[in-house]
Amino acid sequence: MISVEHLTKSFGQRTVFQDLSLQFTEGKVYALTGNSGCGKTTLLNILAKIEPYEEESISYQGQELKQIKQHHFFKHELGYLFQNFGLLENETIAKNLDLGLIGQKLTKKEKKQQEEEVLKKVGLAYLSLDQKIYELSGGEAQRVALAKVILKDPPLILADELTAALDPETSREVMDLLLTLKKQDRLIIIATHNPVIWEQADEVIRLN
């Protein structure tokens, strides 16, 4: 699904990747690990079309990633769980989850029902959809971000330190959810230092 061939990436005089080649296949969970500053987040941002890269060295579904329009990629192909959650902090949970349902023709009742169901899936049934994001703990906000991606249901999910704000038990619950998505032929790539994710991933890739 994603083929990285001889990728080179530099920031000024600092080379992050030199001749990096990797293959990612749908229906699998990949864990990216390595020391801080090794390029995990940079690689995710490149795959998300946020960070530019040199040469035409990445293909997605057989097409050069650079040739895919960014708007289409963000709207239809990608779910990105940012390290800082990527949520609208001053908006309600419902407003944030609405972003995962863009493009779906749903009544207000259907939308609310789906959002309440996904909160149950991520262990947040006790929260109200009217609560503001800034009122939540870090772990709760992280799970709301995951709920938004689940609603969007994209073929590619990227996650940066997905479980950083979660305890080990909740980390396993979140991974169980991702493994369910994996069975639906989703490709999931997670940058993480968490051994819980290493254990459950199909492949662990260590960047130097």
Predicted regions: what they are:
Residues 109-127:
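Conserved ABC ATPase "signature" region
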Residues 157-160:
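Catalytic Walker B motif of ABC-type/P-loop ATPase nucleotide-binding domains
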Residues 56-66:
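Conserved ABC transporter NBD signature motif
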Residues 2, 17-19:
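Conserved structural motif at the start of ABC-family nucleotide-binding domains
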Residues 48:
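Helix-to-loop junction immediately C-terminal to a conserved catalytic motif
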Residues 65-79, 183:
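ABC ATPase NBD coupling module
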